[in-house]
Design a protein with these regions (language model features):
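Extended hydrophobic leader/signal-anchor segments used for secretion and membrane insertion
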Residues: 1-118
Length: 118
């Protein structure tokens, strides 16, 4: 499938890592796939600063695994970071790609999962 065709129904949303971004979370909670552009070095080399990624909503059926890059809210801040550890399939430890741990979250605060780098 052509990338333009893949993205024709996508909501574009830019976001700064660590800043409040209720709009992105709301789009994902409404079942919309979104494009997020994160900025900063916390996820290099997995993601480069300014690199757009396609994020799909997390539903009850979504499989979440260690290493997945997710859009989540931790301690009042939104991040596009990865799952570091999983406890009992209910709690997820979120951190960046350089060893910094943001904290533990429940599945209900993981709004989206990165499915493709653009």
């Amino acid at each position: 499938m052509n990338t333009n065709e893949e993205l024709k129904d996508i909501t574009p949303v830019n976001y700064w890592i660590g800043k409040e971004n209720k709009i992105s979370a709301q789009h994902l909670q409404n079942g919309e796939r979104i494009v997020i552009v994160g900025f900063g070095q916390s996820m290099t080399p997995i993601l480069k600063s300014g690199q757009p990624v396609l994020v799909e909503p997390v539903t009850e059926e979504t499989k979440l695994s260690k290493g997945d890059v997710v859009f989540t809210k931790v301690n009042g801040h939104y991040y596009l970071h990865k799952i570091i550890s999983i406890r009992n399939d209910k709690s997820y430890q979120i951190g960046n790609n350089h060893g910094h741990i943001n904290g533990w979250v429940s599945r209900s605060t993981i709004y989206g999962k990165m499915v493709k780098k653009l």
